[in-house]
Design a protein with these regions (language model features):
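Secondary-structure transition/capping motifs at alpha-helix termini
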Residues: 1, 109-119, 142-151, 175-186, ...
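Residue patterns forming the tRNA-binding/recognition surfaces of aminoacyl-tRNA synthetases
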Residues: 1-84, 167, 199, 207-250, ...
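NTP/phosphate- and nucleic-acid-binding module
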Residues: 1-46, 70, 85, 115, ...
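Residue-level signal for inorganic ion chemistry
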Residues: 14, 190-191, 254, 317, ...
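Flexible, glycine/threonine-enriched loop-and-boundary segments that flank and lead into catalytic domains
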Residues: 63-68, 94-125, 169, 173, ...
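Alpha-helical recognition segments enriched in aromatics with Gly/Pro capping
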Residues: 71-73, 78-79, 92-236
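Secondary-structure capping and boundary motifs in well-ordered enzyme cores
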Residues: 117-129, 148-165, 215-219, 243-253, ...
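Acidic, turn-prone loop/beta-hairpin segments
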Residues: 118, 195, 268-295, 323-408, ...
């Protein structure tokens, strides 16, 4: 009798798919849900709310885990069955790996009925049944006699949110059954890459026309990593060529500023030095504070925030500090050899530290520059990131205000469609005592940066105010 009924079809090719009832292999889930919840509580989830997804899955799972599949590919079950009574014959651990379709069991007859003929298991394991043993593989489980004594939780598992219920959960299941403990200390969950409208990237939607190799050729591998590393923890990231372009611009700037610094290090010899100029103390102290936040973000697995934090400092370094110190580097006869060396030492130190921090995101360009300028180790990726140890809190505070004054004065030039090199005939400032001392300590740098002819500083209790700025309009 022919019956007409609805069946599911494959989403791509439309082929009908029907389920057949067959014997399968299962792992017991239902009797240990509380154990799996307990292990989940022992793990730190990043972001924390992703732990809720794990708990919801464990609490709501309603059946045991079927680990067998009827496919042509996969890891085979190391099992045979007695042809007469069906008794399963399992391979011993020392005999693994085996393929029962081509290998025979290491027994002559069935221990139950004595039959000497065996039928191989034809099923293969589910994807998650094999990928869930990754911690054991990393610890070379089964390859050493004392494997139980050296298995410890891994520090970190990284994956996207959709496989919390599969890869994460089933790895926890395996770890529980093997060792009764958590497989890792931390889980870092990423989001998905989405198309511009927040849609899933799919050929059928026509929103995935860009080939990866073309993107690499256009923006570089480091540029792709900039885009990939800019996302927030646990949050979807939109594919954006604008972000790729920003990454390319940043990488080009890293290269260009490195070449500028290299040009001024031709006669530089690295040695102990503490007689830094005021503005050098400002940038060194600012980097030290920035790197504390940078490391904090990394410790929290907020890679995107760490990159953004580092990038903001880099542009401040280029747009402000380099513009100030370049006069000292170019004109030692005017500024003096020691102030010039202070600038050399500072750019040498800051660039080295920037390359170390950026190397996490841009391994290729940072290695290229490192090999050209430093080479105190085989690779920048083998160097140890050590925090700077300065006490420049006062210089940071007042240095930021000096930069603010410089920015306002430059803005005045731009508003008048003047070159930034336009001389300032008179700059009159109201400043408090601390800032006055700071400006006087860096007066050569300050005046050279703004091309100031006459600088007047008046006392005030406030931070600062520009009273008068007289531009040389004849040089327009």
């Amino acid at each position: 009798e022919e019956l007409e009924h609805e069946v599911q079809t494959h989403e791509r090719c439309g082929k009908e798919v029907e389920y057949s009832v067959m014997k399968q292999w299962f792992i017991d889930i239902m009797n240990h849900k509380e154990d799996f919840l307990k292990i989940g509580n022992e793990i730190k989830w990043h972001p924390e709310h992703m732990h809720n997804r794990y708990d919801e899955w464990v609490n709501n799972v309603a059946w045991d885990w079927c680990i067998s599949r009827q496919r042509y590919f996969g890891v085979p079950f190391p099992v045979w069955y007695c042809k007469d009574c069906g008794e399963p014959i399992f391979a011993k651990m020392e005999d693994l790996p085996v393929n029962p379709l081509v290998d025979s069991p290491k027994v002559d007859k069935c221990p139950k009925c004595g039959c000497s003929q065996f039928v191989p298991e034809t099923d293969v394991m589910d994807t998650w049944a094999t990928s869930s043993v990754t911690p054991l593989i990393n610890m070379r489980y089964g390859e050493k006699d004392n494997y139980e004594s050296f298995l410890k939780p891994m520090s970190l598992r990284t994956n996207a949110s959709e496989i919390i219920r599969t890869w994460d959960f089933y790895t926890i299941v395996k770890s529980f059954y093997h060792f009764g403990q958590r497989p890792w200390d931390n889980v870092m969950i990423s989001g998905f890459v989405m198309a511009n409208k927040g849609e899933k990237i799919s050929k059928s939607k026509g929103n995935s026309k860009v080939e990866p190799i073309d993107l690499i050729n256009q923006y570089s591998a480091d540029g792709i990593r900039y885009w990939a590393g800019s996302g927030r923890l646990g949050t979807d990231i939109v594919f954006s060529e604008e972000t790729l372009l920003r990454g390319k611009k940043l990488i080009n700037k890293i290269w260009n500023v490195s070449k500028f610094i290299e040009m001024h290090l031709a006669d530089y010899e690295d040695k102990e030095f503490n007689d830094y100029e005021y503005i050098d103390k400002w940038i060194l102290g600012s980097f030290q504070e920035m790197e504390k936040g940078f490391v904090k973000y990394l410790d929290e697995y907020e890679v995107g925030l760490a990159l953004n934090h580092l990038e903001k400092f880099f542009w401040n370094f280029c747009d402000n500090y380099i513009e100030i110190v370049k006069h000292r580097l170019y004109r030692p006869e005017e500024f003096g050899d020691i102030p010039r060396y202070s600038g050399q030492k500072t750019v040498y130190t800051i660039l080295y530290k920037l390359l170390q921090d950026f190397s996490i995101f841009f391994p290729f360009i940072t290695e290229e520059i490192y090999q050209e300028l430093y080479r105190d180790n085989k690779s920048i990726h083998l160097t140890e990131i050590k925090p700077l140890q300065f006490n420049f809190a006062k210089e940071i505070k007042n240095g930021d205000k000096i930069i603010d004054i410089i920015s306002q004065a430059r803005g005045e030039k731009s508003n008048n469609n003047l070159s930034l090199k336009t001389p300032i005939k008179v700059l009159e400032l109201n400043v408090n005592e601390d800032l006055k001392e700071a400006i006087n300590s860096s007066v050569k740098d300050f005046k050279a940066t703004l091309f100031i002819e006459d600088l007047l500083l008046n006392n005030t209790n406030d931070d600062f105010k520009i009273n008068k700025i007289e531009l040389d309009l004849e040089s327009k």
